[in-house]
């Protein structure tokens, strides 16, 4: 009885958070608190709407998700400029809000030019692709994804994500604050959450692309998926066996025969980690780069790696074993 009441109350709160544009629901606001100044919490954030969208889809309420996808697609072509510099065409906004001008409603987007630290959202376009696939799977409305403007949008995102860059890794290099929240969290580099989203977005794009140009992009996507999969599974994985290997690494190795390819220093391993990881558990590291391995456990990155099959079956089981055996540390009383 109590659970039923809580679910009913949750739905009522979700209904009150819905954003309407010209009479149609297009998203949900980040937060509704009448006692706190809104700041930008009165906007609909791309990443924040995704769990709400999945809930709507599982309950057969796909209209709001379809409207969200269409309106954010239109915002993708908005001006993305700060100090006379234009950002990449495939960029999706971090958030948007409904504004009234001359008694007419308009959607205004924030691509990071208003964010704290002025950081561009890297994850928005990745979440958008994943949500588009989820919508198609839930409704069977593949015609929406096959519309020319949607195909063009998918290719713009791929062009942005797969561009040549100064990097030897198949992972995506991103600045701090470019996902989750626009605050410094020590995640500059190749954070797991972005790699998991990147992998899921590439898999989604591969399913949704059509036509001759689509086939061309599928080949590029397939190439990246295979090397990204290998890279994450081989180098990001942490369990007791892997920790023991790192403890025996030698630093400053050079050449093709180097075992310690990322020059990880054994003394950088937190003293508590060997006691914390259970014998049957393991997880994917939070970040990896030259002389840097982030040993923090990032739940969303690991769970998305399972969801997208970026993690192997064995790794997926080990991650779930870790969460189960360290439930109090990771979940607590939530």
Q: Could you say what each language-model-derived stretch is?
A:
Residues 1-334:
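Acidic, mature catalytic/reactive cores of soluble proteins
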